[in-house]
């Protein structure tokens, strides 16, 4: 099921989906081990800096392998991305969602480029 469907279901049924950022394999394993005990789904986040440091391909591979190992639905979120080109690249690589931090970009710039990205 797509993340947006889970988000709608959670809102309708009044329950939450946890989102946890990770920057190491150990953190990812810890998050997924805890979530698997509750048989819940999870949103896994990386900041723009973390995703650049770890690499989008590597993050996606780690998450896909971990989803199979722990048998839970997990979705990737780019947390507080600033660079519109990097956000687009993350989505193209398989990130399910993104939070856009627009403090460093004028709103007119964001609006003029956003429609061409997604």
What are these language model-derived features?
Residues 10, 35, 90, 117-118:
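Generic structural signal for hydrophobic
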Residues 16-21, 42-46, 74-79, 98-100:
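Hydrophobic faces of well-ordered beta-strands that scaffold small-molecule active sites
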Residues 99-118:
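Conserved anion-binding
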Residues 1-7, 26-44:
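N-terminal glycine-rich anion-binding loops that anchor highly charged ligand groups
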Residues 38-40, 92-97:
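Glycine-enriched alpha-helix->loop->beta-strand junction motifs that scaffold or abut catalytic
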Residues 87, 92-95, 105-110:
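Active-site loop-to-helix "anion-binding N-cap" substructures in soluble metabolic enzymes
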Residues 4-5, 27, 50-93:
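N-terminal active-site wall of soluble small-molecule enzyme domains
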Residues 1-19:
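N-terminal amphipathic alpha-helix/helix-capping segment at the start of soluble metabolic enzymes
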């Amino acid at each position: 099921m797509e993340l947006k469907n889970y988000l709608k279901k959670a809102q309708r049924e009044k329950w939450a989906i946890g989102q946890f950022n990770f920057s190491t394999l150990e953190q990812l394993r810890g998050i997924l081990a805890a979530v698997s005990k509750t048989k819940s789904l999870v949103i896994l986040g990386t900041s723009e800096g973390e995703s650049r440091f770890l690499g989008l391909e590597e993050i996606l591979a780690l998450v896909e392998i971990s989803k199979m190992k722990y048998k839970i639905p997990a979705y990737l979120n780019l947390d507080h991305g600033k660079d519109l080109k990097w956000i687009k690249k993350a989505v193209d690589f398989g990130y399910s969602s993104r939070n856009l931090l627009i403090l460093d970009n004028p709103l007119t710039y964001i609006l003029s480029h956003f429609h061409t990205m997604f």
